[in-house]
């Protein structure tokens, strides 16, 4: 007689699976609530305390933590001395363990959950049984996922439970218990940067490929999902999101979260292409499109208001990969869904992104930092020039600062209030970004109102000089260079407003 031990929190699929095991000749052993469910279904089941000859105790905290259980799991069937020892102590081998764990994750997601409630939902016996079974996978089938029940039954019936399949189930167990423990560790940890960093993610999607066709890829969600994420967006129309789609859409969502005003953000290769605001969404679109009507092709568009028909008509004429918005009117959806390859996503928008750790892979490890969520406000500005800013210039500088923090360094943004005019991204030296952004901006309507924002300080006064000589009248930068005095002097010489924000926004 082969023996299966079942102890599950998630009862889905349990009864038909258990009945199949009985038909296959398994003797069932179970614990607590699982035992009751199986008995109520009319199955013959041995209670765990009949196996251990010891009652459950401490409010169920101790049920399966017993040598008669773990010896039955860990004994190697290919070692005569192991089997002899089981016989000596009259221990029956256990050939299958079916366990899923206390719902710690769903418990800590409940509003108002206490630490005591969370701790009571930390499973001890379940992971112990799973790990014992997984270690001895050559002899014991460890099953942690109800989705595997049908596959296991079919393989048992066909006699196809080979070593490779057993090994895959064992790997799944250790992945599951590691993720479970990581979730607990992160819940209990009170420091952002512990000595041992444990991260829990769950597969969201197998992707066609990564950044390029020769790179395999998958997407994973954090074990405790964030509501404001492209991975939680509803895909109303279009095919599966690609790796690059997800990265670009994420960049767009981060930028548009900076603004409460009606705003449209366009993104290409994770850099903003154009950003516009207006009294209506259509007007905001017009501003964003005019900001860079070339780079937008093949790009991502994020809008923080419901998409109406008028705006949809204008977007329909352009090749776009994704449009993401809180919602679409029926008319707007009909217009845009006519484009087969356009992906339409909905996601409730927010201007409050929670502070979390950002993890970046490097060869041999990761670097970890808190998100750059410093709010931009003219209250943080210090005017260091003799020239004083106008109200309109201050508003434009706040707008530009919210953009420049999302541009790859060295980053320069030329903008007027409510519209970017030129964006210089990713240049190895700052003056090149200054030159490029101004060249993009200077022939556009509204350049006479333009201000310039820099993500980091100017190491020399050449950026101030170039900007002033090409029509920029107000500049905002963090300050902090040993040559700040040179930049201030140049601004005063040329009559330019120079403001220090006090906050650097490098982005690599």
Curated annotation (Swiss-Prot):
Pathway: Purine metabolism; IMP biosynthesis via de novo pathway; 5-formamido-1-(5-phospho-D-ribosyl)imidazole-4-carboxamide from 5-amino-1-(5-phospho-D-ribosyl)imidazole-4-carboxamide (10-formyl THF route): step 1/1; Purine metabolism; IMP biosynthesis via de novo pathway; IMP from 5-formamido-1-(5-phospho-D-ribosyl)imidazole-4-carboxamide: step 1/1
UniProt keyword Hydrolase present: yes
Gene Ontology molecular-function annotations: IMP cyclohydrolase activity; phosphoribosylaminoimidazolecarboxamide formyltransferase activity
A Pfam family that the UniProt record links to this protein: MGS
Domains: entry comment: The IMP cyclohydrolase activity resides in the N-terminal region.
Similarity remark: Belongs to the PurH family.
Protein name: Bifunctional purine biosynthesis protein PurH
């Amino acid at each position: 007689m082969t023996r299966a031990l079942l102890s599950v929190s998630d009862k889905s699929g349990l009864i038909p699976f258990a009945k199949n095991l009985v038909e296959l000749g398994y003797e069932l052993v179970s614990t607590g609530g699982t035992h009751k469910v199986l008995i109520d279904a009319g199955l013959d089941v041995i209670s765990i305390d009949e196996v251990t000859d010891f009652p459950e105790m401490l409010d169920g905290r101790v049920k399966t933590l017993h040598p008669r259980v773990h010896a039955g799991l860990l004994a190697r069937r290919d070692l005569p001395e192991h089997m002899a020892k089981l016989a000596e102590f009259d221990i029956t081998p256990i050939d299958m363990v079916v366990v899923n764990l206390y719902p710690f994750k769903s418990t800590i997601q409940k509003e108002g959950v206490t630490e005591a409630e969370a701790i009571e939902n930390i499973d001890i016996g379940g992971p112990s049984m799973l790990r014992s079974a997984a270690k001895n996978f050559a002899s014991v089938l460890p099953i942690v996922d109800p989705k595997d029940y049908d596959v296991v039954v079919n393989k048992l019936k066909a006699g196809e439970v080979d070593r490779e399949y057993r090994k895959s189930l064992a790997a799944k167990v250790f992945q599951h218990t590691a993720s479970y423990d990581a979730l607990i560790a992160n819940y209990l940890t009170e420091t952002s940067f512990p000595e041992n960093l444990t991260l829990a993610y769950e597969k969201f999607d197998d992707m066609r490929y990564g950044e390029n066709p020769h790179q395999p890829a998958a997407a994973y969600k954090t074990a405790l999902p964030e509501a404001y994420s492209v991975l939680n967006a509803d895909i109303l129309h279009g095919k599966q999101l690609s790796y690059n789609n997800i990265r670009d859409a994420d960049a767009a969502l981060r930028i548009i979260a900076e603004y409460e005003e009606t705003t449209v953000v366009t993104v290409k290769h994770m850099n903003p292409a154009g950003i516009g605001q207006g009294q209506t969404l259509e007007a905001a679109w017009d501003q964003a499109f005019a900001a860079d009507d070339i780079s937008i092709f093949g790009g991502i568009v994020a809008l923080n208001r419901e998409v109406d028909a008028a705006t949809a008509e204008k977007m329909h004429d352009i090749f776009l990969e994704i449009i993401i918005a809180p919602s679409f009117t029926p008319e707007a959806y009909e217009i845009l869904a006519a484009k087969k390859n356009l992906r339409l996503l909905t996601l409730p928008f927010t201007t409050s992104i929670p502070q979390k750790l950002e993890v970046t892979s490097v060869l041999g490890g990761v670097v970890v930092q808190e998100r750059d969520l410093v709010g931009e406000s003219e209250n943080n500005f210090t005017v260091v020039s003799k020239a004083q800013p106008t109200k309109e210039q201050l508003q434009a500088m706040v707008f530009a600062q919210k953009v420049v923090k999302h541009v790859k360094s060295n980053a320069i943004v030329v903008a007027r209030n409510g519209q970017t005019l030129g964006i210089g991204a990713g240049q190895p030296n700052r003056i090149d970004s200054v030159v490029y952004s101004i060249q993009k901006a200077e022939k556009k309507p509204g350049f006479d109102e333009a201000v310039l924002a820099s993500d980091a300080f100017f190491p020399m006064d050449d950026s101030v000089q170039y900007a002033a000589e090409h029509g920029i009248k107000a500049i905002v930068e963090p300050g902090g260079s040993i040559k700040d005095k040179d930049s201030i002097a140049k601004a005063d010489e040329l009559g330019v407003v120079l403001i220090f924000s006090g906050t650097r926004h490098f982005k690599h």
